[in-house]
From Swiss-Prot:
Gene name tied to this protein: ostc
Keyword annotations from UniProtKB, A to Z: Membrane, Transmembrane, Transmembrane helix
Main location: membrane
Stretches assigned to the Extracellular side: 54-83, 139-149
Pfam family, one: OST3_OST6
Lineage: Eukaryota, Metazoa, Chordata, Craniata, Vertebrata
A biological-process GO annotation: protein glycosylation
Transmembrane segments: 33-53, 84-104, 118-138
InterPro entries: OligosaccharylTrfase_OST3/OST6, OSTC
Organism whose genome encodes this protein: Xenopus tropicalis (Western clawed frog)
Keyword Isomerase tagged: no
Protein name: Oligosaccharyltransferase complex subunit ostc
Amino acid sequence: MESLYRVPFTVLECPNLKLKKPSWLHMPSAMTVYAMVVVSYFLITGGIIYDVIVEPPSVGSMTDEHGHQRPVAFLAYRVNGQYIMEGLASSFLFTMGGLGFIILDRSNAPNIPKLNRFLLLFIGFVCVLLSFFMARVFMRMKLPGYLMG
């Protein structure tokens, strides 16, 4: 395999370039990278690619028994379709659950006082449990009868 890689370089000669990093380009801090990862996670789980391609409405409407139009946030009985608000709401829940796990991990640091550790554990558990149960509620609204019994 090595000889196969060597074949083009018998004819081609690599240029002797002395490249250096621009002085204005600095390595981003860990918090900046983390913020970019969380924002991209929020956008991807919210279905931003689907929203750009399909261009769904932000909310839908449903006619009630009196003939009035009522706004609805969830596109019921359609697994492969969504309104924009539905995607953003579920994306917020997924991100909140992920942040809850990160908060739970941060509560394990050895130099955290007992009260702060308790508060971090409480906030982390609340975020994880709230996002889990609200995602189940969203699934019941999206697919009525799916998670029953």
